Amino acid sequence: MDYNRMNSFLEYPLCNRGPSAYSAHSAHSAPTSFPPSSTQAVDSYASEGRYGGGLSSPAFQQNSGYPAQQPPSALGVPFPSSAPSGYAPAACSPSYGPSQYYPLGQSEGDGGYFHPTSYGAQLGGLSDGYGAGGAGPGPYPPQHPPYGNEQTASFAPAYADLLSEDKEAPCPSEPNTPTARTFDWMKVKRNPPKTGKVSEPGLGSPSGLRTNFTTRQLTELEKEFHFNKYLSRARRVEIAATLELNETQVKIWFQNRRMKQKKREREGGRVPPAPPGCPKEAAGDASDQSTCTSPEASPSSVTS
């Protein structure tokens, strides 16, 4: 008896079924799945008298790496064998079921075993592909993704970003777009055009136009300039209230009057002689339509 042949998984028949029972070539060539209509011929249990009735055609026997149907462990009876008469019939034992480590073309002493989980995807496909007459429910490991859960999860966000970039943003409908609201401060112009409206005599315009002084206002301003070239704020407020002007108008008139006096001193070097009874400053102010007053006149006196 050849024990090496008996112990080899690729050559040893299950339950003395014969040389053609499970003569598988290699477990690596197992296909992933078979349609239910791919099974052709089925071995009969009654005709050959061997265990494995309802098993599929040699297409499954040659591609499967180990038996696909677990023998019932409760039945410990021997089955009739069609092997040569020189061998005693062997009983089916639960130890030959597909739930253990199986040798791959080696003897027991070599220790060449492989775990069934390495072919989880192929075995799961075989169990789903065969019908009621094919492989029954066995202790097959669950299917696993080829790359693992970690790598599959890592691919998801990367491809999600690419898909989001390819998608174009939907165009908003025109009726739903809100109209731009115009506030009151938007309507006010920064630099409004100046109008040529002439202000009333003695009243300053808010737009900063030229102020037309009356003769009475010019006379009182010239009197004050004769005594004081520079005014304090209290005196400026008093003169503005007396002449019905604002404080800014009085301040600007005194600034212009000082610049005019300095210009005349630079150009002529001397001023023309003043008429008797009038100070020298009054002679240069003839163009300003100012009248001469006596030196004894009080600056605060107002003429009617």
Curated annotation (Swiss-Prot):
The entry's keywords: Developmental protein, DNA-binding, Homeobox, Nucleus, Transcription, Transcription regulation
Gene Ontology molecular function, alphabetical: DNA-binding transcription activator activity, RNA polymerase II-specific; DNA-binding transcription factor activity, RNA polymerase II-specific; protein domain specific binding; RNA polymerase II cis-regulatory region sequence-specific DNA binding
SMART domains referenced in this protein's UniProt entry, alphabetically: HOX
Family annotation (SUPFAM superfamilies): Homeodomain-like
Residue intervals passing through the bilayer: none
Polar residues bias: start-end ranges: 58-67, 287-304
Residue ranges annotated as motif Antp-type hexapeptide: 182-187
Residue spans of biased composition, Low complexity class: 25-39
Function in brief: Sequence-specific transcription factor which is part of a developmental regulatory system that provides cells with specific positional identities on the anterior-posterior axis. Acts on the anterior body structures.
Family the UniProt entry places it in: Belongs to the Antp homeobox family. Labial subfamily.
Name of the protein: Homeobox protein Hox-B1
